[in-house]
């Protein structure tokens, strides 16, 4: 049995989409228990495997992250994180304030001893539909080569345990594929990655080939990773708008659009990384999953499923044994 703590109040469409996703999750997974934190006036579910706990406060999207965690002690996000810290829950899921959730993860759930800096990981789509693991996408703007090596180790575990990939191929994001390319960070990181024979390091990868499906894990610093992620999001939205404008521009195009409607919907689904679940803060004493702030019920359900798999696979213990101090 896996038990998850869930923030009912976080996100643009909460609590309705959270309640819908939670209801579907407990119906689909008979080995799942949920502790739901939020406003009792908005709680509508009744299920033997859902425990509800009232919280008098909510962390807003515009709240300053660290201040909110410290001051809003009775918020749904803080109480959710405390349930993971105490061992009452195996992991947690929230679509709320990203900075606040990362702060809750670091200051409440706690970092695994031996992990220098936790990393935010997301699974992004590829042309062939299999996707790739990408980290760090914003937990740490600055990084040292040693941090990127640990990110690779964490990403390797994630790809194996969560995505079911044996001996995942690991690449370093760079401005060229040659070993000597890049700045001091990428050059030194390349050396460290190449020396770690526990990893299947296949070399550098350029941003233009990220979605080709040639690798399973891509490692970079949080500043670069966040920019790449937002660029991909923006590009996908722009392409979608351009396609829509083109289809609606003439009767001929409208007819073609009607014929291709199903195919276009499938294409949009393949490009939507929320299909793979949320982003995960790796390197903590518990699983912390961040669903997209604008998640619908389906995307939040995927994030719940992702946290459940992490609990089943005991990913935190594996990280402790492989990357943490217990490995030393």
Curated annotation (Swiss-Prot):
GO CC terms in record: cytoplasm
EC number: 2.3.1.274
GO molecular function terms noted in the UniProt entry: phosphate:acyl-[acyl carrier protein] acyltransferase activity
Location in the cell: Cytoplasm
Reactions catalysed, as given in the entry: a fatty acyl-[ACP] + phosphate = an acyl phosphate + holo-[ACP]
Pathway(s) per entry: Lipid metabolism; phospholipid metabolism
Pfam families: FA_synthesis
Superkingdom of origin organism: Bacteria
InterPro entries attached to this UniProt entry: FA_synthesis, Phospholipid_synth_PlsX-like
GO biological process, one term: phospholipid biosynthetic process
Family as reported in the entry's similarity comment: Belongs to the PlsX family.
NCBIfam families found in the cross-reference section: plsX
Function, in words: Catalyzes the reversible formation of acyl-phosphate (acyl-PO(4)) from acyl-[acyl-carrier-protein] (acyl-ACP). This enzyme utilizes acyl-ACP as fatty acyl donor, but not acyl-CoA.
Subunit structure: Homodimer. Probably interacts with PlsY.
Protein name: Phosphate acyltransferase
